[in-house]
Curated annotation (Swiss-Prot):
It comes from Dictyostelium discoideum. Signal peptide: none annotated. It comes from the Eukaryota. The lineage of its organism: Eukaryota, Amoebozoa, Evosea, Eumycetozoa, Dictyostelia. This is Probable ubiquitin-conjugating enzyme E2 N. The gene is ube2n. Its EC number is 2.3.2.23. Residues 3-149 form the UBC core domain. GO terms for biological process: postreplication repair; protein K63-linked ubiquitination. SUPFAM superfamilies: UBC-like. The ube2v/ube2n heterodimer catalyzes the synthesis of non-canonical poly-ubiquitin chains that are linked through 'Lys-63'. This type of poly-ubiquitination does not lead to protein degradation by the proteasome. Mediates transcriptional activation of target genes. Plays a role in the control of progress through the cell cycle and differentiation. Plays a role in the error-free DNA repair pathway and contributes to the survival of cells after DNA damage. Heterodimer with ube2v. GO terms for cellular component: nucleus. It catalyses: S-ubiquitinyl-[E1 ubiquitin-activating enzyme]-L-cysteine + [E2 ubiquitin-conjugating enzyme]-L-cysteine = [E1 ubiquitin-activating enzyme]-L-cysteine + S-ubiquitinyl-[E2 ubiquitin-conjugating enzyme]-L-cysteine. Pathway: Protein modification; protein ubiquitination. Belongs to the ubiquitin-conjugating enzyme family.
Length: 154
């Protein structure tokens, strides 16, 4: 970790020693800018009971630019497309160097609790959410059962 900026070292150490509830983030052994992330589906959401794997990459200009994050686990969510890309303001125009990896991961976890079909990335899912929320949530639960119940890989 010696060649990394101190900030990345400190953030990584904090993620390892003080993990946020329901979130695991582990740096790759060969690239400390790349993290394997697992987020547990929040209680009382259609994603409850699932464990969602993501990848997070810190670009060379981090923290001046947001980390690159995407879901590896298939998910039925209006703000996450089929490639795993996430529609979240702090990953785009609302990014600030004051934000940290931990903040990003907590925000993604919160997005699982409160899908926003009015700011979609997956337009078909958002339309389904708007026209029949009950059915869309049932499909999200089904996808969670099908794709997100595997144990977390280390």
């Amino acid at each position: 970790m010696a060649t990394l900026p101190k900030r990345i070292i400190k953030e990584t150490q904090r993620l390892m020693t003080e993990p946020a509830p329901g979130i695991s983030a582990t740096p790759a052994t060969d690239n400390f800018r790349y993290f394997k992330v697992a987020i547990s589906g929040p209680l009382d959401s259609p994603f409850e009971g699932g464990v969602f794997n993501l990848e997070l990459f810190l670009t060379d200009d981090y923290p001046m630019s947001a980390p690159k994050v995407r879901f590896l686990t298939k998910i039925y969510h209006p703000n996450i497309d089929k490639l795993g890309r996430i529609c979240l303001d702090i990953l785009k125009d609302k990014w600030s160097p004051a934000l940290q990896i931990r903040t990003v991961l907590l925000s993604i976890q919160a997005l699982l609790s409160a899908p926003n079909p009015d700011d979609p990335l997956a337009n078909d899912v958002a339309e389904h959410w708007k026209t029949n929320e009950k059915e869309a949530m049932a499909r999200a639960r089904e996808w969670t059962r099908l794709y997100a119940e595997a144990p977390v890989e280390n």
